[in-house]
């Protein structure tokens, strides 16, 4: 099964692409945002760790019903980089475990492809398990405009803090196999999606062969090794600049 890593900066249109892949092409979606909400529900281990770490920093961390005040938590961590790293350190292991379980489920169901929809695909090194990576991008001006329209409660400073906390568009493009430019119309975006799907669709023969241990192991190993090599080359290039 081909795992397609889908990522993109905030308010670039990744969710639009994910819905199109699900509705038009019937691809199963492993949604990291959805999983991230589930693992921080009251009673979950990640929830307890977040409360312990942030309760003295964010007075309104919890809502009346005991759930996390996601707006207050987000505003805080996007203004405090070290705390954003701490939050990611708490949530990422739980999110990874849940994602791997879901990917395994779709593999056993016999799907030819599944989409791993992750905002921090490269930051979390999850691209290493993907056969193909796709990034959705747009201009920073359009990104800011869309973010403030989608989240009117954010000030311009808060919105810019969220954008600046993420990987740059240039780095994301350099690490992606395919780029979807979302600066124009929805029709244009859909045409780009159609083109990418046609290029990456695995054959039925390959899908069947991957259920045989030798072929499956070689296929998986080649993906991981190629991703690690690509990352190593990119790190060398960055160091040389």
From Swiss-Prot:
Q: Show the InterPro entries listed in the entry.
A: Depp_CoAkinase (IPR001977), P-loop_NTPase (IPR027417)
Q: Which residues bind ATP?
A: 8-15
Which GO terms fall under molecular function for this chain's record? Answer: ATP binding; dephospho-CoA kinase activity
Per the record, GO CC terms? CoA-synthesizing protein complex; cytosol; endoplasmic reticulum; extrinsic component of mitochondrial outer membrane; lipid droplet; mitochondrion; nuclear envelope
Question: Where is the protein localized?
Answer: Endoplasmic reticulum; Mitochondrion; Nucleus
PROSITE patterns listed in its UniProt record: DPCK
Q: In which pathway does it act?
A: Cofactor biosynthesis; coenzyme A biosynthesis; CoA from (R)-pantothenate: step 5/5
EC number(s) given by UniProt: 2.7.1.24
Domain of life per record: Eukaryota
Q: What HAMAP family has UniProt attached to this entry?
A: Dephospho_CoA_kinase
Put simply, this protein is called Dephospho-CoA kinase CAB5
Output the lineage of the source organism.
Eukaryota, Fungi, Dikarya, Ascomycota, Saccharomycotina
